[in-house]
Amino acid sequence: MATVIRLTRMGRKKQPFYRIAVTDSRKRRDGGWIELIGHHNPMVAEKTTVVDNERLDYWLSVGAKMSDRVKKITGR
């Protein structure tokens, strides 16, 4: 199973926020996930991002790959 760390869109129309989720690469964007490791809210004045770095490091150590957007948000 190829695991990917990517964003899932939540919120309502024109007011999105995103969860940072570990999921199987074959699932849809908002499909089932294995674990939620953070969230990102781009709609507030200061864009807030909360990530559980310990779990992020764990998933990277077992071979999960980050999407380009998650790399940019987390600064890794």
Swiss-Prot record:
Gene3D superfamilies: 3.30.1320.10
GO molecular function annotations of the record: structural constituent of ribosome
A single Gene Ontology CC term: small ribosomal subunit
Keywords of this entry: Ribonucleoprotein, Ribosomal protein
Keyword match DNA-binding: no
InterPro entries in the record: Ribosomal_bS16, Ribosomal_bS16_CS, Ribosomal_bS16_dom_sf
A family per Pfam: Ribosomal_S16
GO biological process: translation
Matching PROSITE patterns: RIBOSOMAL_S16
Similarity-based family: Belongs to the bacterial ribosomal protein bS16 family.
Protein's name in the database: Small ribosomal subunit protein bS16
